[in-house]
């Protein structure tokens, strides 16, 4: 089963930047997390962007959409910052014949207490099992793109 993985940045890829505790988006964590999960066959990981999702714009979403639409894999996993993940998921709707799953993390993937490995594992399963469509995976759930929002007050995703 062919799966494409695209990375766009976000907290999942963040690293400490300076002594003040500021972060910046570093190299993608996906491959490292999948190696730790002991996957037998790790798909190629393509870095599209290295941005905090709050810095993403419509041009970035179009770049992601084009990459997803033009890749030959019927199943696509996209790592993304959580703040604007839903907006990007909605921008990917309408791409036919593909199962597209977006996931990210609320804590950097390099942190031991991060939700990154769990979210990525669930997303990897979802991309293989869900029918064609666009989904957001977070907080132990798989949400259809048109039925999810991020509750900023609770810092979690929920069904709408």
Regions found by a protein language model. Give the residues of each.
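Active-site histidine-anchored catalytic micro-motif
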Residues: 1-160
């Amino acid at each position: 089963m062919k799966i494409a993985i695209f990375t766009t940045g976000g907290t999942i890829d963040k690293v400490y930047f300076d002594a003040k505790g500021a972060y910046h988006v570093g190299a993608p964590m996906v491959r490292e997390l999948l190696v730790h999960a002991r996957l037998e066959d790790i798909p190629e990981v393509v870095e599209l962007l290295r941005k905090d999702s709050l810095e993403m714009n419509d041009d970035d979403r179009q770049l992601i959409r084009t990459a997803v639409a033009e890749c030959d894999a019927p199943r696509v996993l996209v790592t993304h910052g959580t703040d604007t993940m839903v907006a990007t998921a909605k921008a990917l709707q309408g791409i036919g014949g593909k199962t597209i799953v977006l996931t990210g993390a609320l804590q950097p993937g390099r942190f031991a207490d991060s939700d990154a490995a769990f979210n990525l594992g669930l997303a990897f399963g979802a991309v293989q099992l869900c029918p064609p469509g666009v989904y957001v995976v977070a907080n132990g759930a798989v949400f259809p793109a048109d039925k999810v929002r991020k509750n900023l007050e609770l810092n979690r995703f929920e069904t709408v």
